[in-house]
């Protein structure tokens, strides 16, 4: 007894101390005293009874392949001990003859499994079967418990649940051993944990067609989805239903789910195990979806669904909504125009539910309460429940969020007496008002944690289902949702950030985990501010610098992600690109595009020809968006995900993506801006004006020469000079106009030129600076740029190293308003770059300040 208590204590310690499920229990050191899994690239053999559950057998076959991924060779599979199974892995559910034998020999404690739900135990046993010296035993309380134990071992040897759906590389090992001990993840806190593939056109549907050659989701596609769900320790799925019909499209879909161990359901508006498309495709034959006028046909439709699903684990949705996911009585897509009579609808729904349960009882041959059902309180249906609609006591009542991840309703203490329990339908993808959210993952796990913690603490723990759209690119929220549904108590506010770190460690390795998790957390925070579909030029304040701030944050994040991407081994880059680099680049580019549009509109309204530069930037960003998406479709994993990133996301004018294709945001251009010369008038800000030299008001050209723009010269934009340099500069000048407020009686003018040496006039080259109509000040700007002892280190070297010369002149101001500053070269080689007019606010700056606003 004492020995048993000690082993149970150790078991509890394992549960409490380790991550999903157990950290640091596998080693490459075969001399560590552990149980050998791989030795010199040869994996240990596996024994499983041939009469065990099909789902167990399929999982074991996948384990064989996982060993091959890790060491290059498949584990041999046997149905009974042989000479090759002296050391082996034994896998079995509680019904397995081998597990029964171990229990009978008291090598497994039956109490740890019997009556438990989806629990596994993984432990090393000596002499478990005749002819077997030692085995790693994976025993499950039921089929799924066993499957979870098998896939836990797969994770331990280095195969991520996302090896297929995110192309996570498998680390190769020649030797592996598992530490001795008893390991379990216990039972799940939430009984049914699943996904809803929804809003699947055009991305998922196109990818499936490109990958499997079908216009629907067939069993080969769904088998990959089921495997992912099981590797993540989920057990439930609502299949895609916009244009597909899970049950009707491929007769192998449902058996594949049953064989693999996934429980099927239908969405909140698809009652009685029937897909909406099964009705929509036969409307002419069936008539209208109206229970008042067409009950006989609808009841038969319901009977066929239950009859088809009576021998599997499918959870049957009951209730009824309108045709096409609308309120009962409303036309498809016109919920907002419909004014229902709630009292009549409640009576009708109660009648429908009673009739549905009669059908369930008759078709299954047992009381309706013995077949699991759920009723979804989605949108208007919650109102009926609040007004007193009666729900049978054995039915799961499924609450929902507001489609944006905020919980609408939770049960009261009195309602918790409902024996059927409560569920939650949660979204990280949505089609609906105020605007679709389909393109990228924009839901921070902090928000999911907050709302699902609330959900769990209020007793909603029977069923959780997550609307994941096309499944990709929701890899991380799916993982967090499944982990959290298994054990909501595991993460609180103090340790929540451990989850993204552990997730990144599993996908990219320990050495990359901290940085990848930091980038993932920042992306989630930035993306969670506003969806890409809701973002536009007016979202952030451009005047306060807020818009530039958020764009700069994305620029830095993109640089960090690209830096880490380039540091990864080649085989990890596809996974990193899917999880982090693509969404960061895509959203950073969208932010840049709308910021550019905001700047374009602002400068256009001011008459500033720089508006055209920003218009060009909008168009370049729009083009880059298509390049990024094309790269996702055509380049990642050799084009494996072709079609998965074709969702429209630019051009919304209403809630839906009814526009034909992505549309470049509207820009405005100042006509003939490139042909127009001069005319700039600057506005002061914060006590100074900064002007790029090319933005003059007027110029005067000398005979046989002209002022010429030198693009990209200098520290910010460009330079201007008289060309050719050999020309006589007499009579030339350039004038800059700017406004000054009342109360300014003196300004300090800083003229920034290129660091031209005195190549012609040894005493130095000169220009004059003055206000129009006033006496100008002569400036010798390079007379001290020489190698004389008093100049070489003090002036020349520092100046030429900075490549600019800054000279300061003070000028008196007689009146406020528009001023005209005239600069006239007296010698050749003057290259003007920037002019700063300071009247009390300028702070010395290496780039001489951001150019002031102007009009033209």
Name what the model sees in each region.
Residues 1-22:
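Bacterial Sec-dependent N-terminal signal peptides
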Residues 230, 235-238, 244, 252, ...:
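Structured mid-domain segments that build the active-site/substrate or prosthetic-cofactor binding neighborhood
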Residues 108-293, 310, 374-378, 388-406, ...:
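Feature activates predominantly on carbohydrate-active enzymes
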Residues 548-682:
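Histidine-centered catalytic/metal-binding microenvironments
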Residues 654-856:
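Extracytoplasmic
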Residues 20-187:
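Contiguous, structured surface segment used for ligand recognition
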Residues 38-53, 205-209, 324-338:
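Acidic/histidine-rich, surface-exposed loop or edge segments in extracytoplasmic proteins
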Residues 170-177, 241-242, 248-259, 286-419, ...:
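Gly/Pro-rich turn-and-neighbor structural signature
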